[in-house]
Amino acid sequence: MNQTSYNKKIGVSGLAAYVPPYRVWLEDWCDWTDNQWPKIREVVGRSFRVRGPDHSVYTMAATAVMRLIEQYDIDPAGVKFLGLGTESSTDNSAGAIIVKGMVDRALEASGRPALSRTCEVPEFKHACLGG
């Protein structure tokens, strides 16, 4: 390999997430549903987050992508891979491309270039599909 091969930026270079602001406390949930709090606490934890009325899996993912681009000052035109991992997609074939479109519109609105046209946009689902 030549020297330039070793200088390429490969791998994960940043991480960002979006966590919805809405939370359900599981102790309260147990009171409402007549479930056993000690068991739920041990198995699930103390709370879980839920999306708001203006949120979807796509808006939450697009928000996380925009945070990643902004926090790490990433050139969107240089992004070659944008993977969406979810158990909650409403469209089993187009979720990641929907997120890419949302991100491209947000980038355009902020005066930045869109993600690369050659950016790969797969969607991954690995858990809870069987019910």
Residue ranges and their predicted role:
Residues K39-S56, S88-G131:
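Conserved catalytic cysteine-centered active-site region
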Residues M1-G83, V103-E108:
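Conserved "HGTGT" condensation-loop signature of ketosynthase/thiolase-family condensing enzymes
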